[in-house]
């Protein structure tokens, strides 16, 4: 460890910034946010200084540095391109035993400024020790996505209840209690702006702990998106990493499953065509049972839980049994897969509406409003349609679409194994068989498919995909 991380209390302290550049303005802003009074020595100030908060605590005291400016100062920051000039300031500060930071010159620093994640009063600092500030900023950006902005409010809530917890809970149990609180629905309530509910839940947890009553569980119904872990929402990822149990379907990709809490129990419930590992009714009651055992239960579904995901049925059961739950939307396959295939679902010149339908066969037939679906100015997105693809295409032609209507089928959309086959309603069933496509797939029908050749941007297997893809005009032997 090259540096010892230390947080300085600069409130009402006096600091000097040498330099008037945009970077100097950013350094001055940090000092002002920490409550310091800031003096600036520079021949001119960047416009960024005009935008700083609490400017009444900032004063330009000189055009150039002189040692006398260090009188009464508690810290010095130097932003100076001229190495010799920076050396003079650093030496003068060190001679007075003042902490000094020189931007981009670690050798002249007695302290360094980390990248900061501010969730006051919670503060997180990330530093590369001056070796790679850009890398530290990138790491900070990643952490920003994982730490909700409401953490400050959560900390304030805990502070208000600290005395109550001290009175109600034995010293040896307090640490475990607060860990349970911060990993419970109390935190999620604060993050979603339900502060009064969070206080009520915290009150209940204090009473339960004092009386040694069992913990109260909750169900997180989370959409995992179309498969690519980069498409998870921040909220989904946060809940995935705090759940005690993960109940997941076949359509949840392994990379996404790997992002769940490592020590969480995992329960696979299948949900594959004609092979439901666990019947839906049993899944519903499993969620109730797990929550009533006090477990934070993650119900992880591919896509969005409310679009052909049977999420509504599951939370109906939870409501009937008085189980707390929350729903996190996911990017549905239609939106995610179409985007990665380079096919816009709507377009001013081609489609003014879009229909999501399920291609699931029931007794070898479809139960669809074909007249409402088979419209030339509409894009049709068909989930779970691979098995019935020939019948789907035939029915769409029968109900008004032409045989040469553009159509595409996408396998493993958004993943590195994505494959896209394009053709027409007349040719797509044969092309899908020749390509050997396997579920999961998504079918897109409509004139917007014409845009794929121009707009395709995601090519994880460019050479293989080019060989598999077929132009809209089918070869003679397939026409």
UniProtKB/Swiss-Prot annotation:
Protein's name in the database: Siroheme synthase
Pfam families tied to this protein: CysG_dimeriser, NAD_binding_7, Sirohm_synth_M, TP_methylase
Annotated function: Then it catalyzes the NAD-dependent ring dehydrogenation of precorrin-2 to yield sirohydrochlorin. Finally, it catalyzes the ferrochelation of sirohydrochlorin to yield siroheme.
Residues noted as binding S-adenosyl-L-methionine in the record, renumbered to the chain: 226, 302-304, 307, 332-333, 384, 413
Region Precorrin-2 dehydrogenase /sirohydrochlorin ferrochelatase: start-end pairs: 1-202
Record-listed Phosphoserine modification sites: 128
Pathway: Cofactor biosynthesis; adenosylcobalamin biosynthesis; precorrin-2 from uroporphyrinogen III: step 1/1; Cofactor biosynthesis; adenosylcobalamin biosynthesis; sirohydrochlorin from precorrin-2: step 1/1; Porphyrin-containing compound metabolism; siroheme biosynthesis; precorrin-2 from uroporphyrinogen III: step 1/1; Porphyrin-containing compound metabolism; siroheme biosynthesis; siroheme from sirohydrochlorin: step 1/1
GO MF term list: NAD binding; precorrin-2 dehydrogenase activity; sirohydrochlorin ferrochelatase activity; uroporphyrin-III C-methyltransferase activity
Keywords: Cobalamin biosynthesis, Lyase, Methyltransferase, Multifunctional enzyme, NAD, Oxidoreductase, Phosphoprotein, Porphyrin biosynthesis, S-adenosyl-L-methionine, Transferase
NCBIfam families the record matches: cobA_cysG_Cterm, cysG_Nterm, PRK06136.1, PRK10637.1
InterPro entries: 4pyrrol_Mease, 4pyrrol_Methylase_sf, 4pyrrole_Mease_sub1, 4pyrrole_Mease_sub2, CobA/CysG_C, NAD(P)-bd_dom_sf, Siro_Cobalamin_biosynth, Sirohaem_synt_dimer_dom_sf
Renumbered residue ranges of the record's region Uroporphyrinogen-III C-methyltransferase: 217-479
EC number of this enzyme: 2.1.1.107, 1.3.1.76, 4.99.1.4
Catalyzed chemical reaction(s): uroporphyrinogen III + 2 S-adenosyl-L-methionine = precorrin-2 + 2 S-adenosyl-L-homocysteine + H(+); precorrin-2 + NAD(+) = sirohydrochlorin + NADH + 2 H(+); siroheme + 2 H(+) = sirohydrochlorin + Fe(2+)
Domain of life of the source: Bacteria
Active site: 249 (proton acceptor), 271 (proton donor)
Organism: Thiobacillus denitrificans (strain ATCC 25259 / T1)
């Amino acid at each position: 460890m090259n540096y010892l991380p230390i947080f300085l209390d600069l409130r009402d302290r006096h600091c000097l910034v040498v330099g008037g550049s945009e970077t100097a303005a950013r350094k001055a802003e940090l000092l002002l946010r920490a409550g310091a009074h800031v003096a600036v020595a520079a021949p001119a100030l960047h416009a960024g200084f005009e935008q700083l908060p609490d400017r009444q605590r900032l004063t330009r005291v000189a055009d150039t540095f002189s040692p006398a400016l260090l009188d009464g100062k508690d810290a010095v920051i130097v932003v100076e391109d001229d190495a010799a000039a920076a050396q003079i300031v650093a030496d003068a500060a060190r001679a007075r035993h003042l902490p000094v930071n020189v931007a981009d010159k670690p050798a002249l620093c007695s302290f360094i400024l980390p990248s900061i994640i501010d969730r006051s009063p919670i503060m997180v600092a990330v530093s590369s020790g001056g070796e790679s500030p850009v890398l530290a900023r990138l790491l900070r950006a990643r952490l920003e996505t994982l730490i909700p902005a409401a953490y400050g409010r959560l900390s304030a809530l805990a502070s208000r209840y600290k005395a109550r917890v001290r009175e109600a809970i034995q010293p040896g149990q307090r640490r475990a209690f607060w860990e349970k609180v911060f990993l419970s629905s109390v935190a999620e309530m604060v993050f979603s702006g339900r502060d009064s509910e969070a206080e009520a839940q915290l009150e209940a947890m204090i009473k339960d702990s004092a009386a040694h009553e069992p913990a109260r569980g909750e169900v997180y119904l989370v959409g995992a998106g179309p498969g690519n872990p980069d498409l998870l929402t921040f909220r989904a990822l946060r809940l995935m990493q705090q759940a005690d149990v993960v109940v997941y379907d076949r359509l949840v990709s392994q990379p996404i499953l790997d992002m769940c809490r490592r020590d969480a129990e995992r329960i696979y419930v299948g949900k594959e065509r004609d092979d439901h590992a666990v019947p839906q009714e049993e899944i519903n009651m499993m969620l109730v049972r797990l929550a009533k055992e006090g477990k934070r239960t993650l119900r992880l579904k591919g896509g969005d839980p409310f679009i052909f995901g049977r999420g509504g049925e599951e939370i109906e059961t939870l409501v009937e049994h008085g189980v707390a739950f929350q729903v996190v939307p996911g990017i549905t396959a239609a939106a995610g897969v179409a985007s990665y295939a380079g096919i816009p679902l709507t377009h001013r010149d081609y489609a003014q509406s879009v229909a999501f339908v399920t291609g699931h066969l029931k007794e070898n037939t479809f139960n669809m409003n074909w007249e409402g679906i088979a419209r030339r100015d509409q894009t049709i997105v068909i989930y779970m349609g691979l098995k019935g693809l020939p019948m789907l295409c035939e029915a769409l032609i029968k109900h008004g679409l032409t045989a040469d209507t553009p159509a595409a089928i996408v396998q493993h959309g958004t993943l590195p194994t994505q494959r896209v086959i394009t053709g027409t309603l007349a040719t797509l069933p044969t092309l899908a068989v020749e390509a050997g496509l396997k579920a999961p797939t998504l079918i897109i029908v409509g004139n917007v498919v014409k845009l794929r050749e121009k707009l395709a941007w995601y090519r994880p297997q460019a050479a293989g995909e080019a060989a598999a893809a077929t132009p809209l005009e089918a070869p003679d032997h397939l026409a």
